[in-house]
Every structure is written in C-alpha cells, then in structure tokens.
Amino acid sequence: MKETFGEYIHKLRTEGALTLTKLAAALDIDQSTLSKIENGKRNIPEEILPKLANIFNLDIDQLEKEYFSEKIAEMIYPKENSSEFLKLAEQKAEYKKLTNLKQGKIDFKNA
C-alpha cells in the first residue's frame, strides 16, 4: 500500500458504502476522531485493528503489517539514510526473536 493508513481506511469505508458515523460507531470511537484518522491528523489506536479487520473482512496480519510499517516510516522518513535504519532495525528484530526463543527454552522448574 502506498497510501497512508488513514487514506486506506477512507477507501475501505467509501468502497463499503459506510458513513463516517456508522464506521465510527462500529469502531467505538467518535466521528471526529475517525475523520482525523482518515485525514492523517491522528493515528488510529492499535487496539482498534481487530475491529477494523472484522468489519471489512481483512486479514489481521496484513492489516498489522500496514499499520506498523506506517509507524516505522513516520519515524524514519525525515532521515537521510532511512534504508540503513530499516536494515539495522531488521537485524535488531531478528536478534530479539532469537534471544526470546532461547530464553523460552529454559526449564525453570529444573534449574
């Protein structure tokens, strides 16, 4: 997706013929908040993603990828070497996965 997450929500809402009021009510947020999200003036709270996926019959994993990739992009786009930031972040994420995996195998009962 090359659009912002808010633009994506707007597209889903209009293609689904939902009004701001109806979608906001379904997400349990007020209409002005949803409008700000769609216009990029406010970020959508992460806890709303499962509701959004359910309403539009979307894969939650893909929706989370879009959501978090935008958050990362917002943090690094002003930097000149954004691709280097991404590479380093990916390496750190892999390290954290491996570290957590190793820690998960420790048998604390017999330690």
Identify the function of each model-found stretch.
Residues 1-15:
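A short, Lys/Arg-rich alpha-helix, primarily the initiator
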